């Protein structure tokens, strides 16, 4: 702390920090000298604070066997039953038919809800009009776990939407408010909450507009080392050869977007890599063009059923995570 003060950087309370295998993080105003800051004992790296963005611009059937008319995996009981999938995004329209408990009721979120185990609204309270990337979160959540309530009540397999894992449950974490995307400083906060709900696979269709290996990337990598049974799927962006953070981690799954067809091709805007370090970029491709999924309407109790189409690695990533 004294070393930092000597170069004009003031951080209080460092003596009360508890031990953690994860690096402690401090946000400060730009110091007089980055070179001096990097020479302070214990400083691992310095990076700019950037702005986070979303990555979006009959997929499950193509993922199964390439035939739009069949869902062979469902016939073998491979529908995500008993699996908890997590996603952090722009909010969820929880009264949508993909998620609500009955035709006329949302139900109480928790272990007795048919879809949503956790809906973390500590930052914001839903997928709201006027907020950045309105409808993005509801769409990706539908791609993860949608089972239309009317099909569910009639004990039918899904007939709309795009998810393979219609039997899965969801942990949703709203990280967008009227101020934009505000993911926690430590993404492990999201991963811990997901893990406590028995979640293993976590889907993230967002990140900062940089190809650098960031503090957030390191968090995802460290989490996978400490908890090797968990896996994070991350959208790499829609920038062609560039691979945006945190999909450039070594222990995450970066998913590129393909066309939605029996003989798919790489979508021309999909990020592919390699990383700045020259390592492989995307791990796999999943359908990411004109993906139909849940459409938010911004009304808390409309009991809406509408779908909408969207494209991008944002759409491909939850489809791969539900595979």
Feature-to-residue mapping (PLM):
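Short acidic, glycine-rich surface-loop motifs adjacent to enzyme active sites
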Residues: 170, 191-217, 234-236
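Sec-exported extracytoplasmic/periplasmic mature domains
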Residues: 9, 39-42, 92, 145-149, ...
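A cross-family glycoside hydrolase active-site/sugar-binding cleft signature
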Residues: 49, 173-174, 203-207, 233-237, ...
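Catalytic-core environment of secreted peptidases
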Residues: 123, 259-318
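Extracytoplasmic/secreted envelope proteins and their assembly/folding machinery
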Residues: 31-34, 40, 137, 141, ...
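Catalytic metal-binding/acid-base residues of hydrolase active sites
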Residues: 91-93, 207-209, 236-241, 260-261, ...
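Autoinhibitory propeptides
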Residues: 3-84
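Subtilisin-like serine protease catalytic core
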Residues: 72-120, 124-184, 197-200, 210-213, ...
